Amino acid sequence: MDSRRSLLVIALLFISFLVYQQWQLDYHTPKPVATEQVKVSSDVPASSASSSSDIATTAQAQGRIITLENDVFRLEVDTLGGDVVHSELLKYDAELNSNTPFTLLTNKANHVYIAQSGLVGKDGIDTKAGRANYQVDGDTFKLADGQNELAVPFVFEKDGVTFRKIFVLKRGAYDIAVNFEIDNQSDKTIEVEPYGQLRHTLVEDTGNVAMPTYTGGAYSSSETNYKKYSFADMEKANLSISTKAGWVAVLQHYFVSAWIPNQDADNQLYSLTDKANNLASIGYRGPVTAIPAGAKETIRSSLWTGPKLQDQMATVANHLDLSVDYGWAWFIAKPLFWLLTFIQSIVQNWGLAIIGVTLVVKAILYPLTKAQYTSMAKMRMLQPKLQEMRERFGEDRQRMSQEMMKLYKEEKVNPLGGCLPILLQMPIFIALYWTFLEAVELRHAPFFGWIQDLSAQDPYYILPILMGASMFLLQKMSPTPVADPTQQKIMNFMPLIFMVFFLWFPSGLVLYWLVSNLITIAQQQLIYRGLEKKGLHSRHK
C-alpha cells in the first residue's frame, strides 16, 4: 500500500467514524434501565412511603433572591425552597472577550435549568401544601479577602422544629456543601427524606458532525460508574435505581451540574418528566432520617455547578470526572490530556502545547511510520514480479493468490505491513479528537494572530487551507502514483475533501493535523534517505 492509498484509508476510516458517531447521537437508544416508573410529575419526588398526597404539583410564587458569591461563581438562591435558580461562572466569558460571565443555571420563561433540594416524607417541609419559606439575615453574601469558606444559613421553623439549610462556599471551588441541620424541639419524633434534583427544559442537542455535543442527564451508581441518560430516555422511561453512593447530573458542552448525596447512605436515583411544561428532572432521594424529640441531626449533600475540571471533580465524587466523556478511547485520551496540560504548564500557550503533543505522538509512532514506508518500498520492488504473475495466470485467481503468497514469504514481505500502522494510529487520532472537543481548558484559549479560540473553527479558514495544502504536498511526494485511474481521481480530490471537512472543525484539531502532516513530510524524507542506501527507493521516478 503506497502513501496515497494510505491517505484514502485514513479518509475512509475518519469519515466512517464521523458517520457512526452522528448515528449514535441521532438514533441510538440504550435499553431502559428503569425498574419502576414514577407517574407523578411534580416539583419534588413522590414519597416512597405513601401516595402523592404530600407532593407540590403546581408552580409557586417566588420568594426573595439571595446572592452568594466566591471567587469563581455567583449564585442566586430563592428563599422559597432554597433552590439555586441562577449561577454565573466568573472565570468563563459567555462569548469570547465579552467580559460577561457565562450563565449556567437560569430560571427564564423559555429556558429552565435550576438545582432544587429539600426535605420530603412524613414530616417533610416541601409538600403539596407548599415549600419552606426560609428566612435569611441579608441579601448578598460574598467570600471576603483572606476568607477560605463562606457559610450562609437559610432558616425555617415549623411546629417546634428548626430547619437550617446551610450553603457552604469555598475559595476556588465549584462544589457547594448543601447541608440540612434539623433541631427537633417538638415533643415527637419526626421523619424526613432529603432529595436533590436538576430541572431542565427538554431540549435537543445542537452539535453537528464536526463538533458533536450532548445536553442531557447522566448518573453514577454502585453498579455503573458513569452513564448518560438523555432527555429522550427520560421521556421513554423514568430512571429508578437504588444505590449506595453515586450522583446525578445534567451535562452540556464543557459544563456540568451535579447533585452528590451522602455517599454512605442508600439513595434512590430517579428522573421525572413534565411534558405539559416541557421539563425534565433527574435527581436523588435519600433514606428516611428519624430525629427524636429534643435531638439534632445533619443531612449532608453537595452540588457541583461549573466547568468540567477533571482533577477537581475527581476529588468531589467518585467518577464525576467521567462526565468529561472521551468515548471508547478514554484510556488513550486521559494520558494525552495529561501530556497536553503538562506541556501547557511549561509553554503557557495551548496552541504550542498542541504542537508539543503532536511532536511527542509522532516521535512515539515513528517506528510504525518507518515500518509502514519500508513495507511499501518492498511492495513497490515486487511490482514487476506481481505484474508478470497477473499476465501469466490471467483468470486463475486461486493459482495467482498462491503464487503471490509464496513470493511474499520468499521476499519476507508483509502485504498488510502498510495498513497495520495506520490502523494503530487511528485510535490515537480519535482520542486526540475527543480530547480537543471535551477539554474546557481549550475553550476561548488563544494561539497566535487570528486564532483566538482553539475550541472554535478558524474564522478565516487559513488553517484548513494550509492543512489541505500539506496533504496535497504529502501526496505529491509519494514515490509512485496510484495505477488505477478511478483511485487516482479520488486521491487527487482527497486534500480538497479533507479541507472542506475541516472548515468547521475546532482550530486546535486542525492545528494538530497540519503539524502532523508537516512532521510526516519530514519523517518521510528521512526514511527515504535510509531506504535509498538499501536500494529500496529511488528519488527518480
From Swiss-Prot:
Signal peptide: none annotated. One of its GO terms (biological process) is protein insertion into membrane. It comes from the Bacteria. GO terms for molecular function: membrane insertase activity. Keywords: Cell inner membrane, Cell membrane, Chaperone, Membrane, Protein transport, Transmembrane, Transmembrane helix, Transport. It is found in: Cell inner membrane. GO terms for cellular component: plasma membrane. CDD domains: 5TM_YidC_Alb3, EcYidC-like_peri. The chain crosses the membrane at residues 7-27, 346-368, 416-436, 454-474, 495-515. It is a multi-pass membrane protein. It holds the Pfam family 60KD_IMP. Interacts with the Sec translocase complex via SecD. Specifically interacts with transmembrane segments of nascent integral membrane proteins during membrane integration. Belongs to the OXA1/ALB3/YidC family. Type 1 subfamily. HAMAP family: YidC_type1. Required for the insertion and/or proper folding and/or complex formation of integral membrane proteins into the membrane. Involved in integration of membrane proteins that insert both dependently and independently of the Sec translocase complex, as well as at least some lipoproteins. Aids folding of multispanning membrane proteins. This is Membrane protein insertase YidC. It comes from Pasteurella multocida (strain Pm70). The gene is yidC.
